A protein has these predicted regions:
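Short, well-structured alpha-helical patches and their helix-loop capping segments
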Residues: 146-149, 172, 176, 204, ...
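Conserved AdoMet/S-adenosylmethionine-binding subsite of the radical SAM
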Residues: 181, 185-189, 199-345, 350-353, ...
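Residues forming well-ordered secondary-structure scaffolds
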Residues: 132-134, 152, 175-179, 210-214, ...
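Short glycine-rich or small-residue beta-strand-to-loop segments that form or flank ligand, phosphate
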Residues: 138-140, 197-201
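Conserved alpha-helical substructure of the radical SAM core
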Residues: 162-196
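Auxiliary Fe-S-binding modules of radical SAM enzymes
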Residues: 1-98, 289, 293, 314-405
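N-terminal [4Fe-4S]-dependent radical SAM core
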Residues: 66-153, 160-172, 392-396, 402-405
Length: 405
């Protein structure tokens, strides 16, 4: 993975990392003038609510997907109209201000060309696959989860609420293997991606497990790539032989997100996973089995950090890494429509500390940056950024940024 070096000194990049954490925790507001200037879904890449609503509030207008800070650190756009950080227009520049003072200039991500194309059955490609920063493509085959039917949604998750709010409105439905194959082919043809992820909610009777095999075949057929550098994100299958089938189908990596390391928290916060996917112990066993199939550093498990004590999360990250699993964490956002809506995440410094320790765990256990990038749906996390800064891997701002005159 070759990326251009950032033009800023590391001291400035560490400041940007802290700002990214703050913007991720507290969100950002945007003025009408700035929003009209960047024109999401026309010039700037727009949000695609194919799985979760990550903003503080639902909305019926287009918002941008993300932006770059001056040193090249990318920040997902998380709208909070009450945030003290506000993106405003200053001439032809978009800037973050706080209490009237300029904090940083930002460059919004340019809308990819394939977003404007349609599949052979007439579906807009931008509703099928979402382009993430650093050349990652994300497919959510389903924007709903059957845990809801039994009242066992993960407490931090708003997948079903997001479908109810945005599904019909934005034309986001179940994706067919052919649709995914066609969008993958268009993204690769545009040279926009070099890694893709397939994920989604749990389907009754675990029918999604067979679906992953059909998707892999369709991607290979339409892209012409036998190795398409894909990650299959699944709930741990009860029959572990299914993991072998993912590898045989052509996926390079797999992921099973355990979410929480403390069993007590896990059973309370993730009742569906605890009761119908074999439980915490089976999940861990499945991850270790997957390492035997895919290899060291080719299996990932994510945790939603900030719900359980940091010490427990770190214990999990250490244990997973020692087993060959890339343990990652995401910043917990108490999303609208989730059971934990209205709760508060830890402070930004809490996550910065966890990110530094996570990156150190990765390196100590012999993972490469390529590995921790390939097995993640998005390698745009705080821990990935720390690795980039430490090893001079940050790209320049020329990576598909939006230039407006």
């Amino acid at each position: 993975m070759t990326e251009k070096r950032s033009p800023l000194p590391k001291s400035k990049l560490w400041e940007e990392l802290k700002l990214k954490a703050e913007l991720g925790i507290h969100g950002v507001a945007i003025t009408k003038q700035a929003l009209d200037f960047v024109r999401p879904a026309e010039l700037a890449q727009e949000q695609v609510h194919n799985l979760f609503e990550m903003d503080f509030f639902v909305h019926d207008f287009e918002l941008p997907s993300g932006y770059d800070l001056p040193g090249g650190i990318s920040v997902p756009f998380r709208w909070n109209p009450n945030s003290a950080n506000i993106i405003d227009l200053d001439g032809n520049r978009t800037i973050i201000t706080n209490k009237g003072h300029e904090v940083a200039e930002v460059h919004f991500h340019k809308r990819p060309g394939f977003y404007g194309l349609k599949t052979s059955d007439g579906q807009e490609m931008g509703t099928i696959g979402a382009l993430y920063r650093h050349r990652a493509l994300f497919f959510a085959y389903s924007n709903e989860c059957s845990y809801k039917d039994r009242g066992e949604d993960c407490a931090f998750c708003n997948i079903n609420h997001t479908k109810d709010v945005y599904g019909e409105k934005k034309g986001i439905f179940w994706k067919t293997p052919r649709q995914i194959g066609e969008v993958a082919a268009a993204a690769f043809a545009e040279n926009a991606v070099d890694h893709l992820t397939v994920s989604g909610g749990i389907i009754p009777e675990r029918r999604e497990l067979e679906y992953y095999l059909d998707v892999a075949e369709a991607i290979q057929e339409h892209t012409g790539l036998q190795d398409f550098n894909g990650t299959a994100v699944v709930a741990a299958p009860l029959d572990l032989r299914q993991i072998d089938r993912f590898r045989e189908a052509g996926y390079r990596t797999t992921a099973m997100n355990i979410e929480l390391w403390d069993k007590g928290f896990y059973e309370t916060i993730c009742p569906g996973k605890a009761r119908t996917s074999g439980g915490w112990d089976h999940w861990l066993h499945a991850l270790k089995y997957a390492v035997g199939v895919f290899g060291h550093g080719a299996v990932r498990s994510n945790m939603v950090a900030g719900i359980e004590p940091k010490k427990r999360t770190l214990e999990g990250l250490e244990h997973l890494a020692a087993s060959g699993v890339v343990g990652t964490f995401s910043v917990w956002c108490p999303n609208p429509g989730s059971e934990l809506e209205g709760h508060r995440s830890p402070v930004p410094e809490w996550y910065i500390d966890l990110a530094f320790q996570t990156t150190a765990i990765w390196k100590k256990n012999g993972f490469t940056f390529q590995q921790v990038s390939d097995c993640n749906a998005s390698n745009d996390s705080l821990q990935h950024d720390i690795w980039r800064i430490e090893d001079d891997l940050l790209p320049s701002l020329q990576e598909s940024r939006l230039e407006l005159a």
